C-alpha cells in the first residue's frame, strides 16, 4: 500500500515564521489561580467576564480572544501545542503541490537541529498560517468547545484552523501529525520514513481516550535526542527513519532515533515531571524523568485544565477523529484526566496530562501485576522447591575452609533501633577469617535471580560479607611524641543491615518477642544454629539418608536423660563400651553428628560422664558452638579458673534408681574435641529463685594467648592433641556496658590484620586502640564473649 507525501496542517512556514514558532523563547505562563501578573502584551483588564485564563499565543504579538460568533465545523481542530505530530491535529487537510523551491529545500540540511531539512516537512505556502490566524480571530474560531464553555483551557492554547473541504481537497488521514492524502490524484512518494507510525484498523487511535489497553516503556530510549521531560516546549518536527512496516499487526521500531527535536530545550534533562500512563488497564506512575517513546509507544501531553469528569458524556465536547489508513471508523470519547481514573476529582491545572499512543506492540505485562506475582513467590519455600538450593548444596560439599587472615576495610553498622547486640555480634563474625571466606565462596543471588529461597540465613550472611572489601594499603605508621606509633584508619561508609534484622521475624525466633532481654550470646547461637540447620537441609538434597539423624544433631540438642540411658540397650548402634585408663570401662552414647562447614569452624564436643556405684560409667557426647563458663563462684577470677571449674567433678543430689533407692551419683565434663574457633561465654547473667535476673559485674581476666590444659581434655584425646592444637589467640571481644541485666549496650573490639592492631567498634563508630585497652579492666564495660582462633591455623 503506497503512502503519499504527507503535509502538515500548518501549511508552509517562512523562515521568519519558523523562527517565531519554533526557535524564539516562549513566554512564561501564570496558571490559575490568576495572580494578576501580566503574561503578555494585553493588560489584565482586557479579560472577559468569567474568564479565568488569559489567552496567549506564544511568540505572537496579539492575544486571541474567544468569540461567540460562528460555530466551528467538525473538520476544524484546536491544538495546545505547535507539535506537528500532536494527535489533536487528526482532521482533513488540503494537499498542496510541491514547488521547486520546496524540493530544493528538502535536499538541504537543517542547521537548527542538525537533521536533514526534509525531516521537517514544511511544504505549504508561507501565507497559509497567517490567513488561518486571521480567519480564526475574526470569526470566533475557538469553536464550539470554547463557545459553550464546557471546557476551560490554560494560557497558550492555540487555534490553528484549517477547512478540510476547501479547494476540493480529498480527505486526508493524519499519521502522527502528518496529513497523508488518501486520494488517487494526490502527489507523493512511498517512503518508509513515514510508514513507521501507521495505525491499524483494529485499534483506531483517539486523542482523549486513555482507557484502551496500552503499552508503557518507562525507560528513555538510549542515545535518543528528544527531550526527556514531557512539557509543552518539546516541539518535534521529524520522524523515525529506516523502518518499513508491511503488516500493521506487528510493531515497527526505528533503527535510528525515535523522535527528533526541532529546538534544543535547555531544561530537557531536568527530573522534575511526574508522568502517569496506562499499561494494560493498570495505572503506572513514573517518577522523575519523562518517559520516552520506545517499543511502539509515544507520549503526548495535553495541558488542558479544569477537566470535570463528573459532567455527563453528552455535554463533553467531541474528541477529534482519527482516520486510519485502512478506513477504520472514528471514535469519539470525552476528555478525561488521569486523576479521574483514581477518583472523581478535578486534576491540578498546573500538571500536564500524559497520553499514551500505541503502535500495535504486543501487550506488555503490567509491572504492578508482575510485582504481585513476585510477592506471591517470595518468602520461605521448602528446599525441594528451591531451584538454586541444589547448586549451593553442591558447592558446600566441595568447600574447603580457609583460615588465612584477610585485611578488610572496617565499616560501622547503623543502629536505628535496639540492635547493638546484633551489630556487635556481626562485627565479630566478619573478623573471623574462615567465616568470611565461607560466605564469600557462596554466590550472591539478587531478588530477581532468586525471588523465593529456602536458605534465608545463608543468603543474608552472604550479602553481609559482600558488604566488606579488602582494605586499601594503609599509610606508613607515623611517629608521635614519646616514640609512640600512631596508625591511621580509613573506615568505609557505615550501613544498616536491615536484611539481617529481618531474619528474627522471617525465621520466627523467640528473640523477636517483645520484652525479651537482648542477649548477644543468644543471638550468636541463633545465627550459628540457623546456618547449620540450613546447611543440613541442603545436604539432604544430595544424601537423603541424613534426614533421620537431623533431629538429634547440632549443639541445640539436649543431653540424653539418665533414665533414657538406662533404657537404652547395650546393643544400640549409638553406644559402645570404651576402655579407659586403668582398664576402666564406660558406655558411651553419641548421636550421629552430621558435619557442616559451620561445625567445621565453631563446632566442638564435650563429654559428660556419669559415675554411679556398682555400675559402668555412662558417657554422652554433646556438641557446642559456644563454651559456657560459670563465673559465679568467688574463686573464679580468670578464664583459666572458669575452665577448670567446668571440668571439676560434681555430685548429683537426689538421684534414684528404678527400685526407688537413692544412690550416689557424680558427673564430670571434659573437652572431647576443640574447634578451630573457640567462643567462650562468660555467664554474667544469673537467674534468682524469685524469677529475677542480675548481672555479675565482677572482672574476669582473659589472656590474648590462651592454652587449654591437658587436664581439661577427655582421657582418650589427651595424648592426641599437641600444644599447637590447644593454643588459641584472641581476635574479638564482645562487651556488655552497664550494671543492669535487663538493659545496657554492646560493643566489640576486633583484631585487624591489615593494621596489625585492634579496632573498637561501637555501632557506626570505628577507632584504633592498642592491645592493652582490650584486656584492661573497665568499670563501665565487662567482657561477655571471647573469640579465639587456633594458632596453628593463623
Swiss-Prot record:
Residues carrying N-acetylalanine: 2
Renumbered residue ranges of the record's region G3BP1-binding: 6-21
Documented EC number(s): 3.4.19.12
List of residues that carry Phosphothreonine: 24, 99, 568
Protein species of origin: Rattus norvegicus (Rat)
Ranges of residues in domain USP: 411-791
Family to which the UniProt record says this protein belongs: Belongs to the peptidase C19 family. USP10 subfamily.
Acidic residues bias: start-end ranges: 561-577
Keyword ATP-binding attached: no
Function: Hydrolase that can remove conjugated ubiquitin from target proteins such as p53/TP53, RPS2/us5, RPS3/us3, RPS10/eS10, BECN1, SNX3 and CFTR. Acts as an essential regulator of p53/TP53 stability: in unstressed cells, specifically deubiquitinates p53/TP53 in the cytoplasm, leading to counteract MDM2 action and stabilize p53/TP53. Following DNA damage, translocates to the nucleus and deubiquitinates p53/TP53, leading to regulate the p53/TP53-dependent DNA damage response.
Record-listed Phosphoserine modification sites: 209, 224, 316, 332, 361, 366, 543, 572
Polar residues bias (residue ranges): 313-326
Entry PTM: Phosphorylated by ATM following DNA damage, leading to stabilization and translocation it to the nucleus.
Activity regulation description: Specifically inhibited by spautin-1 (specific and potent autophagy inhibitor-1), a derivative of MBCQ that binds to USP10 and inhibits deubiquitinase activity. Regulated by PIK3C3/VPS34-containing complexes.
Full protein name: Ubiquitin carboxyl-terminal hydrolase 10
Catalytic activity: Thiol-dependent hydrolysis of ester, thioester, amide, peptide and isopeptide bonds formed by the C-terminal Gly of ubiquitin (a 76-residue protein attached to proteins as an intracellular targeting signal)
Keywords: Acetylation, Autophagy, Cytoplasm, DNA damage, DNA repair, Endosome, Hydrolase, Nucleus, Phosphoprotein, Protease, Thiol protease, Ubl conjugation, Ubl conjugation pathway
GO terms for cellular component: cytoplasm; cytosol; cytosolic ribosome; early endosome; nucleus; protein-containing complex
One GO BP: monoubiquitinated protein deubiquitination
Gene Ontology MF, one: cysteine-type endopeptidase activity
InterPro entries on file: PAM2_motif (IPR009818), Papain-like_cys_pep_sf (IPR038765), Peptidase_C19 (IPR050164), Peptidase_C19_UCH (IPR001394), USP_CS (IPR018200), USP_dom (IPR028889)
Enzyme class: hydrolase
